[in-house]
Each structure stands twice: as C-alpha cells, then as structure tokens.
C-alpha cells in the first residue's frame, strides 16, 4: 500500500516534467509559454520549433503517461491502481509542480496512460480522431472525439474497469480545451498544426 502511494506521487512528478519547455529552451533558446499559443505541448512546439522537435516532445509527453502505468502493472494487479497512477501523471501534465501548477492540455499524456491498459480500444478511438482531423482540419476537434468515443468503445468491448478512468480523462480534456471549444463554436479555431491541442 505504501509503495503504491509512493508510486502514485512519483507518477505525478513524472507527469509534471515539462519536456516541451525543456526542449524548446535547450534546442531553440526560447520559452514556448511566450510564443505561439503559449502552450507547452507538442502542437505549439511544432509551431515554433519545427516538426522534428515537436515529434520528440510528443514522444516524451506520451512516455510520461506510459511509463508510470507500465511500472504500476508490475507493482499491482488492480485496475484501480492503474487508474490512480494514470490520473496522477495526467494531472501532473495539466498542473505541473515545475510550472507553478500550470501545464499543457494532456492529450498526449492521456494516450500514453491508455496504451498499456486499453491499447486496442485506444487505437480505434485514434482512428476516429484521425478521421475527424482529416475531414475538419481541427486537431482540437479530433482530440475531443478521441476522448468522447473512448468510454463508448470500452463499454462495447467489455473493458468496464477503465470506463471511470476514461470518463475522468474526457472531463479533464474538455476542461483543458474549453477555449478551443469556444473558438470552434464561433468558427475561429485554427486548422491543422496551428490548432492548440496536444
């Protein structure tokens, strides 16, 4: 129990690591919080530093969700433990202790959390996400489709233990995308790499 609690706290710290800020400072000499959308995620890093660094940021943001949950599967056989570990990493990205409790939008980190425990369900949701991005041009809309469809897919496929996690993720992602949603409603959202999502 103590080990589980320590790992959940550690997962929050791992999730808090602002790779976008670190990479942009090291390789571009800039603070992404002051340029583009001001977001610390891969989408804004792509915008201000290029696709290569954006992809690297995306990889590490996914990894900081993936790694804690994988370790949790070795520490415990409880889906509740995986849920708490994953949420800790996601909340770390959203409210980083290294960025005065501010952060990114947590789409990439949420994907990382789900890969070890709901891979096929996530893959199907990602296909829907990609389709909507391709058809609409809005990365933010695709992200919202992904997190909205996931609880339904989990229910259909009988992965009931992770439905609560998926619903919490959906709520967090909608909250972190509230400005994007307002722009979508007003028809002011930017398309493709200019969108603020990941």
UniProtKB/Swiss-Prot annotation:
GO biological process: phospholipid biosynthetic process
Membrane topology: Multi-pass membrane protein
Subcellular location: Cell membrane
Enzyme Commission designation: 2.3.1.275
Record-linked InterPro entries: G3P_acylTferase_PlsY (IPR003811)
Predominant location: membrane
Catalysed reaction equations from the record: an acyl phosphate + sn-glycerol 3-phosphate = a 1-acyl-sn-glycero-3-phosphate + phosphate
Pathway connected to this protein: Lipid metabolism; phospholipid metabolism
GO molecular function: acyl-phosphate glycerol-3-phosphate acyltransferase activity
One Gene Ontology cellular component: plasma membrane
PANTHER family per UniProt: GLYCEROL-3-PHOSPHATE ACYLTRANSFERASE-RELATED, INNER MEMBRANE PROTEIN YGIH
Complexes and interactors: Probably interacts with PlsX.
Record family assignment: Belongs to the PlsY family.
NCBIfam families membership: glycerol-3-phosphate 1-O-acyltransferase PlsY (TIGR00023)
Chain's role: Catalyzes the transfer of an acyl group from acyl-phosphate (acyl-PO(4)) to glycerol-3-phosphate (G3P) to form lysophosphatidic acid (LPA). This enzyme utilizes acyl-phosphate as fatty acyl donor, but not acyl-CoA or acyl-ACP.
Name by which UniProt lists this protein: Glycerol-3-phosphate acyltransferase
UniProt source species: Lawsonia intracellularis (strain PHE/MN1-00)
């Amino acid at each position: 129990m103590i080990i589980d609690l320590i790992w959940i706290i550690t997962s929050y710290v791992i999730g808090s690591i602002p790779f976008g800020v670190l990479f942009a400072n090291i390789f571009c000499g800039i603070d992404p919080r002051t340029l583009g959308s001001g977001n610390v995620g891969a989408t804004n890093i792509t915008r201000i530093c290029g696709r290569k660094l954006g992809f690297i940021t995306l990889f590490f943001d996914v990894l900081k969700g993936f790694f804690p949950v994988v370790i949790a599967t070795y520490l415990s056989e409880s889906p509740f433990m995986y849920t708490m570990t994953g949420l800790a990493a996601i909340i770390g990205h959203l409210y980083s202790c290294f960025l005065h409790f501010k952060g990114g939008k947590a789409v990439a980190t949420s994907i990382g959390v789900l890969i070890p425990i709901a891979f096929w369900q996530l893959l199907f949701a990602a296909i829907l996400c990609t389709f909507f991005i391709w058809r609409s041009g809005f990365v933010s809309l695709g992200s919202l489709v992904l997190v909205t469809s996931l609880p339904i897919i989990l229910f259909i496929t009988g992965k009931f233990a992770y439905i609560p996690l998926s619903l919490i993720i959906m709520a967090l992602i909608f909250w972190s995308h509230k400005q994007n949603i307002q722009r979508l409603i007003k028809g002011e959202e930017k398309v493709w790499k200019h969108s603020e999502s990941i």
